[in-house]
Amino acid sequence: MKKILFAAIAILIGTTATAQQPDAVYKLLRYEWTVNADGTTDYHYRHEVQILRNRALVAYADKGETFVVYNPDIEELTVNEVYTIQKDGTRVNMPQNAFVYQLPEECADCGRFNHLRELAMVHTGMELGCTIVVDYTIHRKHNTLNARIPLWRECPVETLEAVVNYDDGMNLSYAIDGSQNLQMDDKDVTRSESINTDNNSRVLHYTFKNLQQAPREPYMPADYIPVLRIFNGTPQFNTPEGDQTFTEASDAMGKVQGKGGVKEQVSAMRNYVVDNIHLNDINPSHLGYTVASPAVTWNTGCGTAADKAALLAAILVNEGYRAFVSGENMDMVSVIIDTLEYRLSIRSKAPIQLYGEAHDEVATLKADNSPEANFDTLEDGFYSLSLAPLAGEPAVRARSLALTRTTPLQSGACDLAQTDTYILPKGMKLMGGVNDKLSFDGVGSMQVSIKQSGNKLKVVRKLKLEKSLVPVSDYANYRKLIAAWQSHGSVMLRMKEMK
């Protein structure tokens, strides 16, 4: 018995150690931009990644191939070098037949993007411990710089560099969003700026050492991962004239708004755009920061994030709202409701959010319903009653939450209360019932009560979550609360027909 126990412990330790080992490591990630005086930009990219485990090639299949998207109309791609260094130091150059030109996946289902190209580089000489080197340059016929470089990747990074060469008269801005999450020594982050008086040019040079692997935890806030932003002004998206006269979606919008308040109606129109206009998630730099007219996006049924945002804004304006495109990448829509600015994502059906001051937008529900009693009959006098999720209930699923966590959890604040009263068949009696309560200070509370009175079955459900963003210190109690709440999603009732 002891041998079996020791073996199990050894397996557990081995599994834990393996799980913590990264699949690969970036020895170098380097980004360099040269903003030229003639209004063009040269983007130079290089990475050197070492393969540590088969998963980097098999499970993810991303380190065995490199994909580069570009627009031949305004961009020229030059591959400088691509090769593999094997464990014994042998250099394996990539043969010409390993370079495959194809339509980018993000351009599928939208004919007006068929001119974009993707170069797929299928790496050769692959083995555990090898290092893949990729180096290429893209010459762009515009000088807009709007770079966002995530500082945490799917595997650790030993050295990350970001370099910008630009004219002394250009206004260049830079910042690290989420810098408080980096937890790095000062010696591992350096920034230098130099001036060349001979040609009136400047150089910005960031260097990061020993960047950690990005956490792989569900429901992590989108802005939690640190990002280096470098930009030379807000991108000026070129939008065709006539956007404010767009009326082609009026009939469709009249059918989807339905009942509810202003926020519900606005959200319904956004949901229609999310569901019915295909998103082609193309970096706007490949399109020269141009935006299609709402009519083009509507009639083709597809578009970039900026295209969809412009369409939704035009729809809302036509419906009488004050709305406009917003967000750093023009992928949000702002709408003014009661003098307050709310924002909607066009990428998902995420709840409408109040913009500006720190604020937990609380989803509220107070409802009394009389639904039809549709019980599933089971064996031995059991019946099953499935309870539908409450409107405003967070999408977090308890079964996907680990015992511990290292990052905050994006949930959603709510204050929900719903009573459902079912009329039971004559003579049907509930054997037992449910009365479950749980509460944690600073986190929230839940209550589920199921009891019978005469021929009525009364189901009372209440859920209150106090914070949209759950800190790590509250995670354990939050997990218990959500698990208890979702355990009542499908209720097993023992009922007996009384003669």
Where in this protein do the model-derived segments appear?
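A sensor for short, sequence-defined functional sites
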Residues: 20-499
